[in-house]
Curated annotation (Swiss-Prot):
Domain of life: Bacteria
Main location class: cytoplasm
Family stated for the protein in its record: Belongs to the YbaB/EbfC family.
Protein name in UniProt: Nucleoid-associated protein HPAG1_0033
Function: Binds to DNA and alters its conformation. May be involved in regulation of gene expression, nucleoid organization and DNA protection.
Organism: Helicobacter pylori (strain HPAG1)
Pfam families associated with the record: YbaB_DNA_bd (PF02575)
Cellular component terms (Gene Ontology): bacterial nucleoid; cytoplasm
Subunit structure: Homodimer.
Keywords, sorted A to Z: Cytoplasm, DNA-binding
Length: 97
């Protein structure tokens, strides 16, 4: 493969990555903690798009903090795992060329 082909290949990969990122915005990852008392949802690019807190937790600040941290951490992990999978899939496609 010569350098002109490599440039075209890289441009194609950039375009594919942009399309995957755009599509990934529509993917929603939801995590719950405290038996569902706290629920958080992130889109595929890591933006928090929904937060639900059971009313009974409003009187127990410490429990709410613990459940919220747990749900947020799980949500972040799900988004990161999804991003890793996308990257590995792209690398797999690149290796086939």
């Amino acid at each position: 493969m010569d350098f002109s082909q490599l440039g075209g290949l890289l441009d194609g990969m950039k375009k594919e990555f942009s399309q995957l990122e755009e599509k990934n915005k529509d993917t929603i990852h939801t995590s719950k903690s405290g038996g569902g008392m706290v629920s958080v949802s992130f889109n595929g690019v890591g933006e928090l798009v929904d937060l639900q807190i059971d009313d009974s937790l409003l009187e127990d600040k410490e429990a709410m903090q613990i459940y919220l941290m747990s749900a947020l951490n799980d949500g972040y992990k799900a988004v990161e795992e999804n991003r890793k999978n996308l990257a590995f899939n792209m690398l797999g496609n690149f290796a086939k060329l």
